[in-house]
Amino acid sequence: MATFEGTYNDNTQALKLAIVIGRFNDLVTSKLLAGCQDCLRRHGVNTDPEGAQIDYIWVPGCFEISLVAKKLADSGKYDAIICLGAVIRGDTPHFDYVAAEVSKGVAAAAFQTGVPVIFGVLTTDTMQQALERAGIKNNLGWGYALSALEMASLMGKI
């Protein structure tokens, strides 16, 4: 029996990535993006928007992330897709609908295409919680980038 495991440094200069970012709550999503870019840069990926390694796609909000991620995955051009967003609970059930649908949609995009689609959408009760998860001490954007690198590596091995 073989054991397969992805790594973070398997020829990262050859990867083609897409990052889909929800513009709603951009105070948070822009910080997640910065953390994601920092991680990718430190692992040898050219994060320049004018470069050839990463396409950045901004969408109005989290609900639109799944559709765009699926279209990108269907294109066959990407080794991994990272989806970044922030859904913050309010006074209505809107939070529940958006959070549920974006998580299902991102998972479906990966299952239906075989392309790693990383779920980097924060679901928090308050803006403060979201900012803490996208801050200097603990920016989850970094972890989402690592997941993309590891999954792209793993999918190339199995």
Swiss-Prot record:
<dbReference type="GO" id="GO:0005829">
    <property type="term" value="C:cytosol"/>
</dbReference>
<feature type="binding site">
    <location>
        <begin position="86"/>
        <end position="88"/>
    </location>
    <ligand>
        <name>5-amino-6-(D-ribitylamino)uracil</name>
    </ligand>
</feature>
<dbReference type="GO" id="GO:0009231">
    <property type="term" value="P:riboflavin biosynthetic process"/>
</dbReference>
<keyword id="KW-0808">Transferase</keyword>
<protein>
    <recommendedName>
        <fullName>6,7-dimethyl-8-ribityllumazine synthase</fullName>
        <ecNumber>2.5.1.78</ecNumber>
    </recommendedName>
</protein>
<dbReference type="InterPro" id="IPR034964">
    <property type="entry name" value="LS"/>
</dbReference>
<comment type="similarity">
    <text>Belongs to the DMRL synthase family.</text>
</comment>
<dbReference type="InterPro" id="IPR036467">
    <property type="entry name" value="LS/RS_sf"/>
</dbReference>
<dbReference type="GO" id="GO:0009349">
    <property type="term" value="C:riboflavin synthase complex"/>
</dbReference>
<feature type="binding site">
    <location>
        <position position="24"/>
    </location>
    <ligand>
        <name>5-amino-6-(D-ribitylamino)uracil</name>
    </ligand>
</feature>
<dbReference type="InterPro" id="IPR002180">
    <property type="entry name" value="LS/RS"/>
</dbReference>
<dbReference type="GO" id="GO:0000906">
    <property type="term" value="F:6,7-dimethyl-8-ribityllumazine synthase activity"/>
</dbReference>
<keyword id="KW-0686">Riboflavin biosynthesis</keyword>
<feature type="binding site">
    <location>
        <begin position="91"/>
        <end position="92"/>
    </location>
    <ligand>
        <name>(2S)-2-hydroxy-3-oxobutyl phosphate</name>
    </ligand>
</feature>
<feature type="binding site">
    <location>
        <position position="133"/>
    </location>
    <ligand>
        <name>(2S)-2-hydroxy-3-oxobutyl phosphate</name>
    </ligand>
</feature>
<feature type="binding site">
    <location>
        <position position="119"/>
    </location>
    <ligand>
        <name>5-amino-6-(D-ribitylamino)uracil</name>
    </ligand>
</feature>
<comment type="function">
    <text>Catalyzes the formation of 6,7-dimethyl-8-ribityllumazine by condensation of 5-amino-6-(D-ribitylamino)uracil with 3,4-dihydroxy-2-butanone 4-phosphate. This is the penultimate step in the biosynthesis of riboflavin.</text>
</comment>
<comment type="pathway">
    <text>Cofactor biosynthesis; riboflavin biosynthesis; riboflavin from 2-hydroxy-3-oxobutyl phosphate and 5-amino-6-(D-ribitylamino)uracil: step 1/2.</text>
</comment>
<dbReference type="Pfam" id="PF00885">
    <property type="entry name" value="DMRL_synthase"/>
</dbReference>
<feature type="binding site">
    <location>
        <begin position="62"/>
        <end position="64"/>
    </location>
    <ligand>
        <name>5-amino-6-(D-ribitylamino)uracil</name>
    </ligand>
</feature>
<feature type="active site" description="Proton donor">
    <location>
        <position position="94"/>
    </location>
</feature>
